[in-house]
C-alpha cells in the first residue's frame, strides 16, 4: 500500500482558520450558530472552529456531537451515542466532518439532527472534499479539495487521536 502525506499540520490549521473566517462572513447572527461535529474527527474539527470563533469574535458557540452510525442506510450499528445538549430549533446548524466522500454520512447526520429539533438552516463544513458523491450533497465550507480515484482513500489524522495533524492519501499497490 502506498501512502503519501498531502496536507501537513500547518495547512490543516490554515484550512480550519479559513473555514472559520467563511463562517463569520456568511452568517449574519453568529449567536444562532451550533456546530455539530460528526464523530469522531469531525468533533475535533468543530472544537477547533469553536476555539477560533472565540479568538476572532469573542463568541462562545456550542458544539454538539453527532453519531451517524444508527442513521446510516448502508451499515446499521447500535445505539445513538450523540451528545446534543442544545435545542437546535431555529438555529443555524453547521455540520462538521473530516472528509466528504459519497454523502451518506452527511445524510445520516441530517436525519440525526432533525430528530433534535427543527433548525432554521443546516450547512456543511468539511476539512477535505474528495469528490465521488452518490447523493446530491454539497459542502458550504471546504478546507481542501483533494480529487481522488475510488481506489484511493483519504485518512485524516488529528492530534487529539493520532498525535499529529495531517491528511494522507493511500492506494492499494
UniProtKB/Swiss-Prot annotation:
Q: Which organism is it from?
A: Streptococcus pneumoniae serotype 4 (strain ATCC BAA-334 / TIGR4)
Give the transmembrane ranges: none
HAMAP family noted in UniProt: PyrR (MF_01219)
What SUPFAM superfamilies does this protein's entry cite? PRTase-like
Q: What is its EC number?
A: 2.4.2.9
List the protein's name: Bifunctional protein PyrR
What keywords are assigned to this protein? Glycosyltransferase, RNA-binding, Transcription, Transcription regulation, Transcription termination, Transferase
Biological process terms from the Gene Ontology for this record are: DNA-templated transcription termination
Amino acid at each position: 500500500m502506498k501512502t503519501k502525506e498531502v496536507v501537513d499540520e500547518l495547512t490543516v490549521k490554515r484550512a480550519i482558520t479559513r473555514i472559520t473566517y467563511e463562517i463569520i462572513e456568511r452568517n449574519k447572527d453568529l449567536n444562532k450558530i451550533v456546530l455539530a461535529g460528526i464523530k469522531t474527527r469531525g468533533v475535533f474539527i468543530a472544537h477547533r472552529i469553536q476555539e477560533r470563533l472565540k479568538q476572532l469574535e469573542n463568541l462562545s458557540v456550542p458544539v454538539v456531537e453527532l453519531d451517524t452510525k444508527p442513521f446510516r442506510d448502508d451499515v446499521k450499528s447500535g445505539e445513538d451515542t450523540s451528545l446534543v445538549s442544545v435545542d437546535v430549533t431555529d438555529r443555524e446548524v453547521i455540520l462538521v466532518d473530516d472528509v466528504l466522500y459519497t454523502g451518506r454520512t452527511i445524510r445520516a447526520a441530517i436525519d440525526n439532527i432533525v430528530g433534535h429539533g427543527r433548525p432554521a438552516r443546516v450547512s456543511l463544513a468539511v476539512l477535505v472534499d474528495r469528490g465521488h458523491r452518490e447523493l446530491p450533497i454539497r459542502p458550504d465550507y471546504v478546507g481542501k479539495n483533494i480529487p481522488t480515484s475510488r481506489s484511493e482513500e483519504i485518512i485524516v489524522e488529528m492530534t487529539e487521536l493520532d498525535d499529529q495533524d495531517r491528511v494522507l492519501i493511500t492506494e492499494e499497490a
